[in-house]
From Swiss-Prot:
It comes from the Bacteria. GO terms for molecular function: ATP binding; glutaminyl-tRNA synthase (glutamine-hydrolyzing) activity. Allows the formation of correctly charged Gln-tRNA(Gln) through the transamidation of misacylated Glu-tRNA(Gln) in organisms which lack glutaminyl-tRNA synthetase. The reaction takes place in the presence of glutamine and ATP through an activated gamma-phospho-Glu-tRNA(Gln). This is Glutamyl-tRNA(Gln) amidotransferase subunit A. Its EC number is 6.3.5.7. The lineage of its organism: Bacteria, Pseudomonadati, Pseudomonadota, Alphaproteobacteria, Rickettsiales. InterPro entries: Amidase, Amidase_CS, Amidase_dom, AS_sf, GatA. Keywords: ATP-binding, Ligase, Nucleotide-binding, Protein biosynthesis. It is an enzyme of class 6 (ligase).
């Protein structure tokens, strides 16, 4: 029998319904795995007492035939989803001991469906990073190793703790947030399915903000079916979030295994020209195109002429919004306060923020403050907003001809911890292929599609039309079936 902590969400639900095991046993297996692999630093707060209590309630519901959709299923939450009475830090010193008195809508939705929370996962500070190396709790180590080297690898970022937890069988699923690729890129690095829904599909209420016009909750799972199950539970209109979309939550599970016949897949191959894309990634992209063609899809060459400006646009707009959002952390209302005798209010602000924020966060606040200044507004911010509109228009034009778009998730496989740490520009380019869809607010997923020559997982990205998560899942499911001969599982786990 498969170890309980290695079961997918769908198989766990089936086993619990058939009374093959209890939720308490399922949760116990995950707790053992977390304790065994604490060296990966995937979790920053463990909620085992809560999880065992929730598991006991789940077993009672199964006994009484009152089981809900996710009854007894173990999940983890990135540490920027506020959890009532449970420390929520965004992995920043400025919020290191913050305990919210309210619950985020997304975690509440999962609790309402019977989900069991194992803990809060590590992340880049305030979700700013692509390698999970900016956390005040230390970096996360990927469960994966290259077959020619035993060096520790990054799990991707900013949701690296969630990716490591699911990839290392320390959770069946895990919540992340995706601003410019922070679910999709770690999923690619760790051999997982990472899904970012349409902007506004999942409520942002109770999510600690980075860039409000880009932030969206997402999910890590080990199968496309699991993604559809979790998305159905997470999504929905929320009057507490002014950016929430008033649209019915669709039935998504029937997308799994649907035919690709007569589907048109857009492929912007020109985006790979002259970029930093590795040969392994290019081969995986070409192989996936052939896979979809053989499955009945029509491949259409498209262009996204403004997508190449995506990284530049993102690193103007996102820091600008961060500069505004993070101004609330001043040492007055909540979080860290640095004080000394005879200190003025301005000195308290300065010392609190200088001490509380890490280097990458300070860098982005400074960039954002400049582009919002009188000298930077016209030259950078307003121009970036115009180009963002052009990026969205490019997608609209493409979707007039195709049903979905296929791109690599990342230009590289996972790299060594510290390898790119001293060059922010190189680090920012990790999001080269994920940022354009974020700027347009589109649903997208990364699904494992191959292994590099060094044995590391590579993800392919599917981008859909607004509110068309169904088609994204359909394509992802076809790719998943086409590579089922590949085992996307780290050695030793």
């Amino acid at each position: 029998m498969t170890e309980l902590n290695k079961l997918t969400v769908a198989d766990s639900i089936k086993g619990l319904k058939n009374k093959d095991f209890t939720s308490a046993e399922l949760i116990g297996a995950h707790i053992k795995q977390i304790e065994k692999h604490r060296n990966l630093n995937a979790y920053v707060t463990e909620t085992f007492d809560l999880a065992l209590k929730q598991a006991e309630a789940a077993d009672q519901n199964y006994a009484q035939n009152n089981a809900r959709t996710l009854e007894g299923i173990p999940f983890a939450a990135k540490d920027l989803f506020c959890t009532k009475g449970i420390r929520t830090t965004a992995c920043s010193n400025i919020l290191k001991n913050f305990i919210p008195n309210y619950e985020s809508s997304v975690t509440q939705n999962i609790f309402d469906k019977g989900g069991v929370m194992l803990g809060k996962t590590n992340m880049d500070e305030f979700a700013m990073g692509s390698a999970n190396i900016t956390s005040c709790f230390g970096n996360v180590i990927s469960p994966w190793k290259a077959n020619d080297d035993n060096a520790d690898l990054v799990p991707g970022g900013s949701s690296g703790g969630s990716a490591a937890a699911v990839s290392g069988f320390m959770a069946s699923a895990a919540l992340g947030s995706d601003t410019g690729g922070s679910v999709r890129q770690p999923a690619s690095f760790t051999g997982l399915v990472g899904f970012k829904p349409t902007y506004g599909r999942c409520s942002r209420y109770g999510m600690i903000s980075f860039a409000s016009s880009l932030d969206q909750a997402g999910i890590f799972t080990r199968s496309v079916l699991d993604s559809s199950i979790m998305l159905e539970a997470m999504m929905g209109f929320d009057e507490k979030d002014s950016t929430s979309i008033k649209a019915e939550v669709p039935e998504l599970q029937s997308a799994i295994g649907s035919s690709m016949k007569n589907m048109k897949m857009g492929v912007p191959l020109s985006l790979g020209e002259g970029s930093i894309i590795e040969p392994d990634i290019m081969k995986m992209w070409q192989d996936t195109i052939e896979l979809l063609k053989n499955a009945g899809a029509e491949i259409v060459d498209i262009t996204l002429p403004h997508a190449k400006y995506g990284v530049a646009v993102y690193y103007v707009i996102a820091p600008a919004e961060a500069s505004s959002n993070l101004s609330r952390y001043d040492g007055v209302r909540y979080g860290l306060r640095v004080e000394r005798e005879n200190m003025t209010l301005d000195e308290m602000y300065e010392m609190t923020r200088s001490t509380g924020f890490g280097e990458e966060v300070k860098r982005r606040i400074m960039i954002g403050t400049y582009v919002l200044s009188s000298s930077g507004m016209d030259a950078y911010y307003l121009k970036a907003q115009k180009v963002r509109r052009l990026v969205a228009n490019d997608f609209n034009n493409a979707f007039a001809k195709v049903d979905a778009i296929l791109l690599p998730t990342s230009p590289t496989a996972a790299f060594k911890i510290g390898e790119k740490q001293n060059d922010p520009t190189i680090m920012y380019l990790n999001d080269l292929f994920t940022i354009p869809a974020s700027l347009a607010g589109l649903p997208c997923a990364s699904v494992p599609a191959g292994l590099s020559a060094r044995g590391l997982p590579l993800g392919i990205q599917i981008i859909g039309k607004q509110l068309d998560e169904y088609t994204v899942l359909k394509v992802a499911s076809t790719i998943e079936s086409g590579v089922k001969h590949i085992k996307f599982e780290p050695k030793g786990f």
